[in-house]
Amino acid sequence: MHRKKGLYTRVYFIVHGAMLRKTFGTGKYLAIKNKIRYDYSVGLQNVPRCKGEIMDTVFFDMDGTLIDTEKYYNVCWCEAIAKFGYTITKEEALDLRSLGRPHVYRFFEEKYGKGFPYDEMRAYRKKIMEEMLKRDGITVKPGAKEILLWLKSRQIRCMIATATDLERTNRYLEMAGLSSYFDEIISAVMVKNGKPSPDIYQLACEKAGRMPSDCIAIEDSPNGVRAAAAAGCRVFMIPDLDEPDEATRALCEGVFPSLSELRRHFVKIL
């Protein structure tokens, strides 16, 4: 493990050595490089970074972060569960935001028992939600297009990391007029475990060819924040429907009221 960690770090120096030498000076650069050469246990967390040197990838959650669809999920979960003779409060349904399999199965089994007809209920929930979105359309969250345009102007790659399946993700982004901003979509259907497990963000980092610590994740829900943080990404949160608790806040580099405010912060740090 140490040898592998040291290899990653040495590759980092090969790629970014010129920038590090220019920023920190030849003496400090060589001292760090020589230490890594003889000590495989040194990881990238111990290597000084140049601000923004490879911070060129941002992962966006979709529902509740870029588009205003979480409110529909919340209503439809409650309605679909009631349709099958069970009850859930809107507050309890918030725990389902971005929750991927097998976590969602566990949620319903623990709450209602093994006989709960999850697959039938979920199919009904999807049906009524599609009817609502067809009726109302999809609203883009305030500041979404502005932050995407700004990131693109800086040649910063934008990718989707969502719990929604690929077909609906592509359709929703098209309906919202956001498809052209994204280089790639990572969906929960592409990994074994969805959020709050880190799998989605681990795959996103792999696709981007970047280490997690060099990637930013933007999320709206606690499950999404936990997934991104567990993968090792820099996490920023734009809360939707409710405010995060202290445990969730502690996982974030910043919590902002809107994507507009986050963009203003990015102007300072990227």
Regions found by a protein language model. Give the residues of each.
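Residue-level detector of anion-binding/catalytic polar loops
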Residues: T87, R157, R234
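Asp-based, Mg2+/Mn2+-dependent phosphohydrolase catalytic module
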Residues: G43, I54-D56, L149-K152, D165-L270
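Short hydrophobic alpha-helical segments enriched in small aliphatic residues
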Residues: R3, T9, G17, D39-V42, ...
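Short, Lys/Arg-enriched N-terminal segments with co-localized hydrophobic residues
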Residues: I32-I54
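Ala/Thr-enriched low-complexity intrinsically disordered regions
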Residues: T9, A18, T23-T26, A31
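N-terminal helical cap/lid subdomain that shapes the substrate entry/recognition surface
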Residues: D56-R154, E167
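Conserved SAM-binding loop
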Residues: L66, V140, C158-A161, N193, ...
